Amino acid sequence: MSEQQTADRLLGITRDGLMALGYSRELLRENYPFVDLTLPASPVERVPLAAFAQEPPSYRTACFGVALVADGAPDRLRRYASLGAPQLVTLHPRDNTIGRWMVRAETEPELLERLAPAEFQQRLIERQPEWNPQEILRAKTIKQPGPRQLDFFDVGLVPMLESAVQSKLDELLREVLADCKAAYHARHRRELNYAGLYRLIFRLIAAKLLGDREHPGPWTDSDADQVIEAVKSHYFARQRGEAVLEDANVRQLAWNRIRTGLHLQNLSVETLAYVYENTLVDPHTRSVQDIHATPRELAEYIVNSLPFELLPQDQRTVFEPFSGHAPFLIAAMSRLRGLLPGGVTAEQRHEYCVRMLAGMEIDAFALEVARYSLMLADYPNPNGWNISAGDVFASPELDARLKGAQIVLCNPPFGDFTKEERAVNPSIERPNKAAEILRRVLENPPEMLGFVLPRLFTQGASYQGLRERLAELYAETTLLVLPDVAFQYSQAEPVLVIAHGRAAATVHRRSAFVSKSDYPEFLRTGRPTWDDQGQAHLSDLRPQLWTPPLLSQLLEATQHLRRLDEVAEIHRGVEYQEPIAKFVSDEPKKGYVPGLKEVRDSLEPYLTLKPVYLRIEDKLMRSNAHELPWHLPKATANAARLTRGPWAITAAPDTSGLVCSQRFHGVWPIRDLPIELLAAILVGPVGNTVIGLQITSRDNQKRIVGAIPVPSLTSAETESIVALVREYQANRQRWMKNARTTNAMQQACHRLLLEIDAAVLAGYDLPPRLEREVLDRFAGEPRPGPVRFEGYYPPDFAPAIPLRRYLSAEYRNSAAHLTLERLKLVDDPAVSAMIEELS
């Protein structure tokens, strides 16, 4: 048998094996061309056979590449990385073997095994569950961590190719646009029709793509107008397409550059979306429309996080308001096609996706780009996509769209409405555009939703009602906070909001966070920096939607400790049926008892100030809080947060029997716990972190205060904290009585505050890095009370040294400047000369 015959036989064996894996004939392409993106010249290469997971073929859907190695040795296999297939099969006719290689993003492919034909066939049979089109496509698509990564797939391959293609295409189109503008202005004095120019560029790209994919038609003709007319006939036969730039010379110039430019056979439609965001949207339009286009990876992350497959096939209807260039619709189209059963024709797939997908967009050019992107993603089918032109907030069509959609995907504008917009549209209820569209979606809740929202959604008071509504409707939620580099042309810090599970019996609340340094890795792998999942039953108190990373780490580190509500009873103060001012006196009166009315006048750390007198009668009260044991020792704390910053709560011991108004909490020990320690727990950084990171309104809710962990302390350590608190109280009282001692007492009280905090922190025994993160929340934040406070550590102090150690005399004495002071200065000429000689 000749070498050529052996090669043909090996190719046939490989083709049959791939078909057995599930790659139908339309997913197998022979003599397939692709551009080598690893070389500056970007030459076109070919492989005898390539297998794809779905149409249209591209580096994003490529699963296997087959290469012929005629001389028996690998010959620059690196070029095949640009195909995008994670596995490369090499045919070696000289020794009648077949090689299997893992394609690397940055280096030469790695040989995994070299097999005889029969062994190769057996290997395909064994690995069918992992190597079928659906599994490989799933592995290549960014998603939440789930099943183990396929052992032959380099997760950096597709991002590397995306970056290379985007860079080359962006450079080409910027040059084309610049040349066209220059040529136009050389011939005309009137203003250039930019929409017509951009429309021309997109049509020529479509022609280039059709030609490079060898679709029947005059796509490679050198005459620009003939090609433009062919694109119009192919895609817009049933409707009138918008006009392109009227200058024939400029049209021809653009086509000459694009026709001979980067080969687009293996291009993915996501790259065209990238071109829209980076090349074809001018800064003015981006600003006016508040455009922060959804990156492809984020759209796919959201879409692949939603269980489309749980819906009946004919009910997977998707609606994308503010569709822009339709990133969610493109991602959803890919997902829908992958869920269709085998045997569905290309025409049936097209008709199905047209029925399932809908969008709405106010910007005419963005809408046109969206249709182009969908057309190209559904290559080579014509137009017909259901994207409406209109203002989402003013269109009467919105309600109908929302009622008809089972899945809503949205990246809305983050800005606020103008006064003019609100004046002409009385249906607007929220000042912010993102909050308003979420409100409207939740009025007609879909089975599933995926939103890109401002970070403020996680805990901002303006979103509290929407968070509560979302929690009521959906049992499965994910809030994934991203850094301010997620959008290319915006520094907004977004959160991905993903929700489904309308009738589940168990609640799952997932909170995740991606740091700026980890964001590139997240785009590659889908793995966040920090991930936390909570579970509860619907009968339980619903856990909050968002748990900040620091709070999660702090609660995990202290989960072995008792909570405050296990060692103390917490109750809100007395509330009157009429305004409290009617029942307050500054002087003692019959029927009145000493008490506290306003936090700002009556409470500072560890001290209650001059009390007022409250009238206490059953008939005046709204509740029975006046019957609580106010006469017993307790700690008093504010019931509403103190500041908008991290300091949320303060407290003071009380043995004088003060009755507190509803603006306070009373905290009574139910075990042998000193009230000074209760106050120190509430005043300290851990208590303020637990409360401050959970507050969604002005109130320090009783259940949140009760969740503060109680430090584990010996009797001696407890007595030490009590003594420090009493010393602080004594110094503060001396300070109030004698203003001349302000400086000395200020320093003494500052030192004592830090020592109390350090002693309480020691009882939590937090990892040093975590303790430092907790304390860093308060850096530069004024502390409630009379003591000037700028933080626990100097601004330039980086080590994670526990506060107690940092304040200790041993640590201070070991500081560098003190060490230098203890060393004697060596001023010996002989020693100096010797050191100079050694250096």
Name these PLM-found stretches.
Residues G156-L197, I201-L204, R213-H215, V495-T643, ...:
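C-terminal substrate-recognition regions of SAM-dependent nucleic acid methyltransferases
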Residues E106-E110, R123-L124, I330, L367, ...:
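Signature of N6-adenine DNA methyltransferases within the class I
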Residues S2-A207, L253-A273, L473, S720-A723, ...:
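Short, basic/polar, glycine-containing "phosphate-handling" surface segments that engage DNA
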Residues L306-E309, F319, V441, A503, ...:
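Proline-centric
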Residues G146-R355, M360-V369, D391, P396, ...:
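Class I S-adenosyl-L-methionine
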Residues L68-S82, Q87-T90, G450, P549-S720, ...:
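Polybasic, glycine- and aromatic-enriched phosphate-binding surface used to engage nucleic acids
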Residues Y184-I201, H263-E270, I428-R430, E587-K589, ...:
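Structural motif
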Residues A536-V584, G591-K597, D601, S712-S839:
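Non-catalytic DNA-recognition/assembly elements of restriction-modification systems
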